[in-house]
């Protein structure tokens, strides 16, 4: 809201939205909640109420009949345990008049300095008789952290005196030992080489990597 103060933002529960609540549009772009499909969760799929919101996306597309739509979600949705759910989602979108293509892409292959694997579903309305083709990975080397943020001036770090680490820590496999740290299998304060891409940046403001 602060970055785009003139944007019309409708925060109504998507399950309550009616046709007249949504303006006509050429395309619908969005990402149904990922928690039900994420490898970091219980992966309950449609058994999770958040997973059922995928069907609300289908409903909205059916209401507005845009020329195209784009759905983004986590790669966990491609796992075998969700095979039937994925087939149902695709058949539901096809049944309302769309040709569907989907593919797992990594943002790092498109000049983004971040390893971020996501599944993209693209639907084109059948009457348009157009075929969508996913772009190939961009040529050349990937953009590194050094190229993206290497010019940022480092600020002094302030340490929490109550969380000083013992010289004989029983916790091993740490990427970094300064400030609030965590094991390398978690996300907090992890550090990637300046010549690599960042870990996947999370939406929440906790467990974030340093870079």
PLM region spans:
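Conserved beta-strand scaffold positions in the cores of enzyme catalytic domains, especially
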Residues: 9, 100-104, 200
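Short catalytic/ligand-binding loop motif for oxyanion handling, primarily in non-cytosolic enzymes
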Residues: 35-39, 77-80, 111-115, 128-131, ...
């Amino acid at each position: 809201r602060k970055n785009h103060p003139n944007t019309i933002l409708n925060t109504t529960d998507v399950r309550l939205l009616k046709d007249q609540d949504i303006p006509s549009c050429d395309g619908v772009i969005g990402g149904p909640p990922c928690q039900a499909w994420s490898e970091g969760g219980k992966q309950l799929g449609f058994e999770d109420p958040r997973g059922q919101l995928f069907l609300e996306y289908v409903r909205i597309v059916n209401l507005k009949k845009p020329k195209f739509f784009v759905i983004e979600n986590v790669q966990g949705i491609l796992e075998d345990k969700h095979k039937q759910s994925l087939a149902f989602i695709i058949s539901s979108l096809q049944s309302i008049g769309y040709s569907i293509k989907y593919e797992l892409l990594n943002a790092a292959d498109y000049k983004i300095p971040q390893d971020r694997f996501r599944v993209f579903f693209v639907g084109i309305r059948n009457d348009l008789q157009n075929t969508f083709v996913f772009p190939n990975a961009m040529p050349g080397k990937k953009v590194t952290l050094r190229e993206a943020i290497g010019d940022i001036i480092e600020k002094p770090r302030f340490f929490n005196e109550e969380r000083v680490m013992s010289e004989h820590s029983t916790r091993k496999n740490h990427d970094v030992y300064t400030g609030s740290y965590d094991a390398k299998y978690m996300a907090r304060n992890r550090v990637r080489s300046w010549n690599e891409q960042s870990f996947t940046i999370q939406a929440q403001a906790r467990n974030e990597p340093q870079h």
